[in-house]
Design a protein with these regions (language model features):
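Auxiliary, metal-adjacent structural segments of Zn-dependent hydrolase domains
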Residues: 28-99
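A short mid-domain helix/strand-loop element embedded in enzyme catalytic domains
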Residues: 81-107, 135, 157-168
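Acidic/histidine-rich catalytic neighborhood
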Residues: 143-189
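Pan-zinc metallopeptidase signature
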Residues: 178-282
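Short pre-active-site segment immediately N-terminal to the catalytic Zn-binding motif
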Residues: 100-120
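Cys/His-rich short segments
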Residues: 1-25
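Short, glycine/acidic-rich hinge or "gate" loops at secondary-structure transitions
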Residues: 58, 137-148
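Active-site recognition of the HExxH zinc-binding catalytic motif
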Residues: 114-135, 187
Length: 282
């Protein structure tokens, strides 16, 4: 924050509309985790030169965040806070900052991957659909790649939670949840591109390179370039990502842990990621 700036909050903190109640140590710790994840998100968005204003700056097109916890009545009834996006207001349930709760939710919903930062990336993807795709000349191309977003969203959610993802969903979708509706497919794909760019930028910054002894294993040398340029060269991004995740998975297996990257990038999924990348850099 500049010394002469009237706003005492940094670019990331100024996007928080509502913080959790701070009456418990758990909520204080949760708020810190939420702000840390949001700060990393904001850094990435600015690095990609994406439009980013608060609702105080642009009431109709800005974005803000509220961090809310479930309400419990005097008789013990719980009113759930749903994580989601609505017209530029992103709500994150404070419970998602609790590692135990989040892991339980991951297992209950049969997800291979569920992180606090991933929630931010997913929900901001919904926001950027409104800004970059809706009412734009990209809309018809979006429908060709992802499907028609005019399909009933509430019904799609009901079907997904009652019946789950269709068989062999991995052939066409990055995650089971992406099968729910074109909006969710887009948001999951958006989050995935952000995962890729952030991890590759970090790997490059610390000098990660791979030169295996075997000829049948991938090599990796990541050139220094700004995130927007990295996304703009999408084919190179995918090649570097394949090599990096090969290494990541082998390292975590060596530690006796699950794969760090439990995803398959099929041909149709790559084309969806390509569409997202093109929208990011347009």
């Amino acid at each position: 924050v500049r010394a002469d700036d009237r706003d005492t909050l940094c670019r990331a903190c100024s996007l928080t509309q509502t913080i959790p109640t701070l009456d418990t140590p758990e909520n204080i710790a949760a708020w810190a985790k939420l702000e840390t994840a949001k700060r990393r998100l904001v850094y990435a968005l600015l690095s990609l030169n994406l439009p980013l204003e608060s609702k105080r700056q642009d009431a109709s097109r800005g974005v803000e965040f509220q961090f809310l916890g479930d309400a419990v009545s005097v008789n013990g009834d719980r009113s759930r806070v749903l994580t989601g996006h609505d017209n530029g207001l992103i709500t994150i349930n404070v419970a998602e900052a609790d590692d135990v709760y989040r892991e339980a939710q991951r297992l209950r919903q049969h997800e291979p991957y569920r992180t606090l930062l991933g929630h931010f990336r997913h929900e901001i993807g919904h926001y950027y659909w409104d800004r970059l795709i809706a009412n734009s000349d990209r809309l018809e191309d979006f429908r060709r790649v992802f499907g028609d977003e005019r399909a009933n969203y509430e019904e799609a959610l009901r079907v997904h939670y009652e019946h789950g993802a269709p068989a062999n969903w991995e052939l066409n979708f990055i995650s089971a949840y992406a099968t729910t509706h074109p909006w969710e497919d887009w948001a999951e794909s958006w989050a995935h591109v952000m995962h890729m760019v952030d991890a590759l930028e970090t790997a490059q910054a610390v000098g990660v390179s791979v030169h295996p002894a075997r000829d049948d294993e991938p090599v990796l040398s990541i050139p220094e370039k700004p995130p927007q340029a990295r996304v703009g060269d999408f084919d190179q991004l995918v090649r570097e990502w394949g090599s990096l995740t090969y290494v990541l998975n082998n390292l975590t297996r060596g530690l006796g842990l699950a794969d760090a990257y439990p995803f398959v990038l099929s041909g149709p999924v790559v084309e969806k990621l390509r569409f997202v990348a093109s929208a990011m850099t347009a």
